[in-house]
Amino acid sequence: MKDLVDTTEMYLRTIYELEEEGVTPLRARIAERLEQSGPTVSQTVARMERDGLVVVASDRSLQMTPTGRTLATAVMRKHRLAERLLTDIIGLDINKVHDEACRWEHVMSDEVERRLVKVLKDVSRSPFGNPIPGLDELGVGNSDAAAPGTRVIDAATSMPRKVRIVQINEIFQVETDQFTQLLDADIRVGSEVEIVDRDGHITLSHNGKDVELLDDLAHTIRIEEL
Protein backbone atom coordinates (compact mmCIF):
# COMPACT_ATOMS: atom_id res chain seq x y z
CA MET A 1 0.00 0.00 0.00
CA LYS A 2 2.83 2.41 0.89
CA ASP A 3 4.45 1.87 -2.52
CA LEU A 4 1.13 2.71 -4.17
CA VAL A 5 0.83 5.91 -2.14
CA ASP A 6 4.44 6.89 -2.90
CA THR A 7 3.88 6.32 -6.64
CA THR A 8 0.74 8.45 -6.61
CA GLU A 9 2.56 11.23 -4.79
CA MET A 10 5.48 11.10 -7.24
CA TYR A 11 3.13 11.39 -10.22
CA LEU A 12 1.23 14.30 -8.70
CA ARG A 13 4.46 16.06 -7.77
CA THR A 14 5.78 15.59 -11.32
CA ILE A 15 2.63 17.13 -12.79
CA TYR A 16 3.02 20.01 -10.32
CA GLU A 17 6.66 20.49 -11.37
CA LEU A 18 5.79 20.50 -15.07
CA GLU A 19 3.13 23.14 -14.49
CA GLU A 20 5.66 25.22 -12.54
CA GLU A 21 8.11 25.03 -15.44
CA GLY A 22 5.48 26.08 -17.97
CA VAL A 23 5.53 22.64 -19.62
CA THR A 24 2.29 20.88 -20.61
CA PRO A 25 1.89 17.79 -18.37
CA LEU A 26 1.64 14.80 -20.69
CA ARG A 27 2.04 11.10 -19.99
CA ALA A 28 5.13 11.14 -22.21
CA ARG A 29 6.74 13.82 -20.02
CA ILE A 30 6.04 11.79 -16.88
CA ALA A 31 7.57 8.71 -18.51
CA GLU A 32 10.72 10.73 -19.26
CA ARG A 33 10.96 12.28 -15.81
CA LEU A 34 10.35 9.10 -13.84
CA GLU A 35 12.12 6.82 -16.34
CA GLN A 36 9.11 4.54 -16.64
CA SER A 37 7.63 2.81 -19.66
CA GLY A 38 4.67 4.26 -21.53
CA PRO A 39 2.32 1.39 -20.56
CA THR A 40 3.28 1.70 -16.88
CA VAL A 41 2.55 5.43 -16.89
CA SER A 42 -0.75 4.93 -18.73
CA GLN A 43 -1.87 2.32 -16.20
CA THR A 44 -0.96 4.52 -13.25
CA VAL A 45 -2.66 7.58 -14.74
CA ALA A 46 -5.79 5.50 -15.43
CA ARG A 47 -5.85 4.43 -11.78
CA MET A 48 -5.37 8.00 -10.60
CA GLU A 49 -8.20 9.09 -12.89
CA ARG A 50 -10.48 6.45 -11.35
CA ASP A 51 -9.43 7.68 -7.91
CA GLY A 52 -10.48 11.21 -8.80
CA LEU A 53 -6.99 12.72 -8.70
CA VAL A 54 -6.44 13.66 -12.35
CA VAL A 55 -8.40 14.17 -15.54
CA VAL A 56 -7.05 13.49 -19.03
CA ALA A 57 -8.13 16.47 -21.14
CA SER A 58 -9.07 16.38 -24.81
CA ASP A 59 -5.54 17.50 -25.76
CA ARG A 60 -4.15 14.56 -23.70
CA SER A 61 -2.75 16.86 -21.05
CA LEU A 62 -3.14 15.83 -17.41
CA GLN A 63 -5.12 18.13 -15.17
CA MET A 64 -5.23 17.68 -11.43
CA THR A 65 -8.62 17.68 -9.77
CA PRO A 66 -9.06 19.78 -6.60
CA THR A 67 -8.37 16.62 -4.57
CA GLY A 68 -5.28 15.82 -6.62
CA ARG A 69 -3.96 19.38 -6.36
CA THR A 70 -4.44 19.40 -2.59
CA LEU A 71 -2.37 16.23 -2.31
CA ALA A 72 0.28 17.50 -4.75
CA THR A 73 0.55 20.76 -2.81
CA ALA A 74 1.02 18.88 0.47
CA VAL A 75 3.77 16.69 -1.01
CA MET A 76 5.62 19.66 -2.50
CA ARG A 77 5.27 21.63 0.72
CA LYS A 78 6.82 18.78 2.72
CA HIS A 79 9.59 18.41 0.11
CA ARG A 80 10.57 22.07 0.19
CA LEU A 81 10.29 22.41 3.96
CA ALA A 82 12.61 19.39 4.19
CA GLU A 83 15.03 21.15 1.83
CA ARG A 84 15.06 24.19 4.12
CA LEU A 85 15.64 22.02 7.20
CA LEU A 86 18.44 20.08 5.52
CA THR A 87 20.11 23.29 4.35
CA ASP A 88 19.49 25.77 7.17
CA ILE A 89 19.66 23.54 10.26
CA ILE A 90 21.47 20.33 9.33
CA GLY A 91 23.91 21.91 6.88
CA LEU A 92 23.79 19.10 4.32
CA ASP A 93 25.78 19.65 1.13
CA ILE A 94 23.53 21.49 -1.30
CA ASN A 95 24.05 18.88 -4.02
CA LYS A 96 22.54 16.20 -1.75
CA VAL A 97 19.55 18.18 -0.50
CA HIS A 98 17.05 17.41 -3.27
CA ASP A 99 17.49 13.64 -3.20
CA GLU A 100 17.26 13.52 0.59
CA ALA A 101 14.13 15.69 0.60
CA CYS A 102 12.54 13.31 -1.91
CA ARG A 103 12.69 10.63 0.78
CA TRP A 104 11.45 12.89 3.57
CA GLU A 105 8.42 14.15 1.64
CA HIS A 106 6.70 10.75 1.90
CA VAL A 107 7.15 10.29 5.64
CA MET A 108 6.96 13.77 7.17
CA SER A 109 3.96 14.13 9.48
CA ASP A 110 1.67 17.16 9.70
CA GLU A 111 2.93 17.74 13.24
CA VAL A 112 6.53 17.97 12.05
CA GLU A 113 5.50 20.41 9.33
CA ARG A 114 3.90 22.69 11.90
CA ARG A 115 7.03 22.59 14.02
CA LEU A 116 9.24 23.36 11.04
CA VAL A 117 7.39 26.56 10.11
CA LYS A 118 8.07 27.77 13.66
CA VAL A 119 11.72 26.71 13.78
CA LEU A 120 12.86 27.78 10.32
CA LYS A 121 13.59 31.45 9.69
CA ASP A 122 12.42 31.50 6.07
CA VAL A 123 9.60 29.26 4.86
CA SER A 124 8.50 31.32 1.87
CA ARG A 125 10.82 29.57 -0.61
CA SER A 126 13.10 26.57 -0.81
CA PRO A 127 16.90 27.05 -0.89
CA PHE A 128 16.54 26.89 -4.68
CA GLY A 129 14.08 29.79 -4.81
CA ASN A 130 10.99 27.65 -5.42
CA PRO A 131 7.82 28.84 -3.63
CA ILE A 132 6.70 26.64 -0.73
CA PRO A 133 2.98 26.15 -1.42
CA GLY A 134 0.01 25.68 0.88
CA LEU A 135 1.51 27.36 3.93
CA ASP A 136 -1.90 28.75 4.85
CA GLU A 137 -2.86 25.22 5.89
CA LEU A 138 -0.12 25.41 8.53
CA GLY A 139 -1.28 28.78 9.80
CA VAL A 140 1.34 30.76 7.89
CA GLY A 141 0.64 33.49 5.37
CA ASN A 142 0.06 31.83 2.01
CA SER A 143 3.10 32.14 -0.28
CA ASP A 144 1.41 30.62 -3.33
CA ALA A 145 2.48 33.05 -6.02
CA ALA A 146 3.54 33.09 -9.63
CA ALA A 147 7.10 31.90 -10.18
CA PRO A 148 9.48 34.86 -9.85
CA GLY A 149 11.45 36.29 -12.69
CA THR A 150 11.75 35.08 -16.26
CA ARG A 151 12.87 31.75 -17.66
CA VAL A 152 16.43 31.97 -18.96
CA ILE A 153 15.30 30.51 -22.28
CA ASP A 154 12.93 33.45 -22.71
CA ALA A 155 15.41 36.09 -21.56
CA ALA A 156 18.77 35.29 -23.16
CA THR A 157 19.81 37.16 -26.30
CA SER A 158 22.96 37.33 -28.41
CA MET A 159 24.05 40.34 -26.36
CA PRO A 160 25.59 39.31 -23.00
CA ARG A 161 24.10 40.98 -19.93
CA LYS A 162 24.08 40.66 -16.16
CA VAL A 163 21.08 39.14 -14.37
CA ARG A 164 20.33 37.60 -10.98
CA ILE A 165 19.38 33.92 -10.48
CA VAL A 166 16.09 33.71 -8.56
CA GLN A 167 14.88 30.14 -9.07
CA ILE A 168 16.27 26.70 -9.96
CA ASN A 169 13.47 24.24 -10.69
CA GLU A 170 13.34 20.72 -9.25
CA ILE A 171 14.31 18.89 -12.45
CA PHE A 172 17.59 20.83 -12.74
CA GLN A 173 18.61 19.54 -9.32
CA VAL A 174 18.15 15.96 -10.59
CA GLU A 175 20.47 16.43 -13.56
CA THR A 176 23.62 15.67 -11.57
CA ASP A 177 26.28 16.65 -14.12
CA GLN A 178 24.67 19.96 -15.06
CA PHE A 179 23.87 20.82 -11.44
CA THR A 180 27.46 20.05 -10.46
CA GLN A 181 28.70 22.41 -13.18
CA LEU A 182 26.46 25.12 -11.76
CA LEU A 183 27.77 24.58 -8.23
CA ASP A 184 31.39 24.45 -9.44
CA ALA A 185 30.84 27.89 -10.96
CA ASP A 186 29.43 29.00 -7.56
CA ILE A 187 26.08 29.79 -9.15
CA ARG A 188 23.29 29.78 -6.58
CA VAL A 189 20.00 31.57 -6.04
CA GLY A 190 20.98 35.21 -5.64
CA SER A 191 24.11 34.96 -7.80
CA GLU A 192 24.65 37.68 -10.39
CA VAL A 193 25.64 36.04 -13.65
CA GLU A 194 26.12 36.95 -17.29
CA ILE A 195 23.78 35.24 -19.75
CA VAL A 196 24.13 35.00 -23.51
CA ASP A 197 22.52 33.00 -26.31
CA ARG A 198 25.16 31.73 -28.71
CA ASP A 199 23.51 30.16 -31.75
CA GLY A 200 20.66 28.74 -29.70
CA HIS A 201 22.83 27.57 -26.81
CA ILE A 202 22.50 29.52 -23.56
CA THR A 203 25.58 30.08 -21.42
CA LEU A 204 25.80 31.35 -17.85
CA SER A 205 29.09 32.95 -16.79
CA HIS A 206 30.19 33.58 -13.20
CA ASN A 207 33.59 34.10 -11.57
CA GLY A 208 35.40 33.30 -14.80
CA LYS A 209 33.56 30.01 -15.36
CA ASP A 210 31.05 29.20 -18.10
CA VAL A 211 28.12 26.79 -17.89
CA GLU A 212 26.43 25.93 -21.17
CA LEU A 213 22.90 24.83 -20.33
CA LEU A 214 21.48 21.69 -21.88
CA ASP A 215 18.71 22.57 -24.32
CA ASP A 216 16.06 20.72 -22.33
CA LEU A 217 17.02 22.49 -19.08
CA ALA A 218 17.21 26.10 -20.25
CA HIS A 219 13.60 26.66 -19.18
CA THR A 220 14.21 25.48 -15.61
CA ILE A 221 16.24 28.45 -14.34
CA ARG A 222 14.60 31.82 -13.74
CA ILE A 223 16.27 35.19 -13.52
CA GLU A 224 15.48 38.82 -12.82
CA GLU A 225 17.02 41.87 -14.42
CA LEU A 226 19.52 43.95 -12.45
Swiss-Prot record:
Entry GO terms, CC: cytoplasm
Gene Ontology molecular function: any one: DNA binding
BP GO annotations: negative regulation of DNA-templated transcription
Keyword Transcription (UniProt): yes
This protein's UniProt keywords: Cytoplasm, DNA-binding, Iron, Repressor, Transcription, Transcription regulation
Keyword Metal-binding: no
Location, primary (coarse class): cytoplasm
Domain HTH dtxR-type: 4-65
Xref: InterPro entries: DtxR/IdeR_SH3, DtxR_MntR_Metal-Reg, Fe_dep_repressor, Fe_dep_repressor_sf, FeoA_core_dom, HTH_DTXR, Iron_dep_repressor, Transcriptional_repressor_C
SMART domains: HTH_DTXR
Entry-linked SUPFAM superfamilies: C-terminal domain of transcriptional repressors (SSF50037), Iron-dependent repressor protein, dimerization domain (SSF47979), Winged helix' DNA-binding domain (SSF46785)
Annotated compartments: Cytoplasm
Oligomer status and interactors: Homodimer.
UniProt function note: Iron-binding repressor of the dipheteria toxin gene expression. May serve as a global regulator of gene expression. Represses ripA under iron excess.
Entry-linked PANTHER family: IRON (METAL) DEPENDENT REPRESSOR, DTXR FAMILY, IRON-DEPENDENT REPRESSOR IDER
Similarity field: Belongs to the DtxR/MntR family.
Protein name: Diphtheria toxin repressor
Species of origin: Corynebacterium diphtheriae (strain PW8)
